[in-house]
Amino acid sequence: MIETHIHLYSDEYAPDRALLIQNAIDIGVQKFYMPNVDVHSIAPVYAVEKAFPEHCFAMMGLHPCYVKEDYKEQLAVIEQELERRKFIAIGEVGIDLHWDKSFLTQQQEALQIQAEWALKYNLPIVIHSREANAESLEVLKPYMHRGLRGVFHCFSGSLAEVTVLKTYGWMIGIGGVVTYKKAGIDILIEEIGMGQLVLETDGPYLAPVPYRGKRNEPAYIDIVAQKIGDILHVSKEAVIEQTNANSRTLFGG
């Protein structure tokens, strides 16, 4: 399996990080893709990548919730990192209107800048869009026309938005929320099909049932794969095979 979105550098994993990673490897997780969130997470991301170089791979980007008054200074630091070394993707970036709408203009500008970087460095982009799919797509569509490729991680949206993403060949990241009864993700998955799905946990957040409300662990991605298989009436193994292929198409490797 390829875990396309997990914050392995989180302090919540500090007591047993190596054990949790090994547990996931033991059940078949081959790669873990780690999104950066701001300038302060860069060093922790690199530390985990250095400790597990065959399995853990860094993204680079500025998360929309960290787009504040100093966002231009943060973007300058992040751009320096992109110039200095290779990354698996630009991420995680996007628009988040759940907590605070006052920085929407700055979030839009930050997303535009980072979409340009994705094209410049020929990297996929990993989108965080919370209560902001219309706003995110408005910014992204011109770049999609120019060949920008990416994934909407932890996707929650409408069938119309699914259609837009499928039209541009974008991937859709599905995690533990698929196990929540009232989330309605099962209907979306039936519409998406396996051809554009990738697996994620978004750990340590959004643990699947029966661990909802607790720390999300990387091995729980197996639960996500099984649930998707149940929804689509295919085996877990078929889900893993196809989502691995989708991940390689997007991220390479």
Q: Across the structure, where does each feature detected by a protein language model lie?
A:
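Mid-domain alpha/beta scaffold segments of enzyme catalytic cores
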Residues: 1-253
